[in-house]
Amino acid sequence: MQTIPDALFGIIGYPVSHSVSPAMQNAAFKHCKLNYLYLTIAAKPEDLQNVIASMRPLNIRGLNVTIPHKIEVIKYIDTLDPAAKKIGAVNTIVNENGQLKGYNTDFGGFVRLLEHNRIAPAKHRFALLGAGGSAHAISLAICTLGGHLTVLARQEEKAKDLAAKMCLRFKGKAQGLELNEANLEETLAESDIIVNCTPIGMGNLAGQSLIPPRLLRPDLTVIDAIYNPCKTRLLEDAEKKGAKIINGLEMLVWQGAMSFEIWTSQKAPFRVMMKEAEMALDENEK
C-alpha cells in the first residue's frame, strides 16, 4: 500500500514530459529513505505566476525550473541566493515556511562537467548559442574560470546584454552577436568549444541544428546542454566530423544532486542518480 508522501517536489517547465529528473530524484529519495515524491509540472509561460504561487497552499517543498522559465520565475519568488542573483536565473526553488527562495545549480553542474572532461576554460575560446537561463549560468562559469566567450542569439540585444554583464565582471572576456550564418562562421573559426544552450534539437525541434555541418571540424569540442535525445542533430553532425561530443546528462545530474542537497541537507547519492537518469533516458528513447 502506498503511503502519503511527507513532502512534494517537482520540475516546472514547458515542455517537461521529456524530463528524467523525476526518475533520478525519486531514486535519490528512496536511497536516502526519505518519504518524498517528485513530479513533473507542465506550465505555459502565461500560467507560471499561478503555479509558483500554488507552492504555498499546496505545501510543495521545492521545485526545479527548466526551459523557458529560469529568468521569468525570479519575478514570483521572495528572495534569491547570492549566486542566483549574480547569474540572473533560477533553476531551484525552496519553500521555507511559505517564503520562496531561488537558487542556481546550473553553474556548479557545468563546472563539474568541465572538470570531469578535463577542460580548463582559460585555455579555450567558447562559442555559446543562446542567451536564456542556462546560458546565463554557463557564461558566468566560463568567464569565472578565465575562458573567452562569444554569445550568439537570434535576438542580438539579448546576446549583447548577456555579454555586457560578463564584461562588467571580467574586463572584455565576452562579446555578443546575432546568431546568423555569417557570425557563426566567423566565430567558430576562432573558437575551439561550442556550447548549445538553446532548445533546438529537442522536443518538437528534434532533428534540427543551428550549425551547418560544413562549419564543424575535428579539433572542436561540442557540448549540448540537451540530454534528451542523448545525441542531438548537432552532436551527430559533430561526431561525423571527428569532433569530441558531450551531451547534457552529466550536467543535469550534477545540478540535480546539488538541488537535492539544498532541499534535504543530505549528501546526494550521485551514482544512484546518474544510473537512474541513464535508465530513464534509455527508456524514453525506445
UniProtKB/Swiss-Prot annotation:
InterPro entries: Aminoacid_DH-like_N_sf, NAD(P)-bd_dom_sf, SDH_C, Shikimate_DH, Shikimate_DH-bd_N, Shikimate_DH_fam
UniProt pathway annotation: Metabolic intermediate biosynthesis; chorismate biosynthesis; chorismate from D-erythrose 4-phosphate and phosphoenolpyruvate: step 4/7
GO process annotations (BP): amino acid biosynthetic process; aromatic amino acid family biosynthetic process; chorismate biosynthetic process; shikimate metabolic process
EC number(s) stated in the UniProt entry for this protein: 1.1.1.25
GO molecular function: NADP binding; shikimate 3-dehydrogenase (NADP+) activity
Pfam families (UniProt xref): SDH_C, Shikimate_dh_N
Positions bound to NADP(+): 130-134, 225, 248
Catalytic reaction(s) noted: shikimate + NADP(+) = 3-dehydroshikimate + NADPH + H(+)
Keywords tagged on the record: Amino-acid biosynthesis, Aromatic amino acid biosynthesis, NADP, Oxidoreductase
Database matches in SUPFAM superfamilies: Aminoacid dehydrogenase-like, N-terminal domain, NAD(P)-binding Rossmann-fold domains
Transmembrane feature ranges: none
Binding site for shikimate: 19-21, 66, 91, 106, 227
Catalytic residues identified in the record: 70
Intrachain S-S bonds: none
Job description of the protein: Involved in the biosynthesis of the chorismate, which leads to the biosynthesis of aromatic amino acids. Catalyzes the reversible NADPH linked reduction of 3-dehydroshikimate (DHSA) to yield shikimate (SA).
NCBIfam families: aroE, PRK00258.3-3, PRK00258.3-6
Subunit structure: Homodimer.
Similarity annotation: Belongs to the shikimate dehydrogenase family.
The protein's name: Shikimate dehydrogenase (NADP(+))
Naturally occurring in which organism (per UniProt): Dehalococcoides mccartyi (strain CBDB1)
Gene behind this protein: aroE
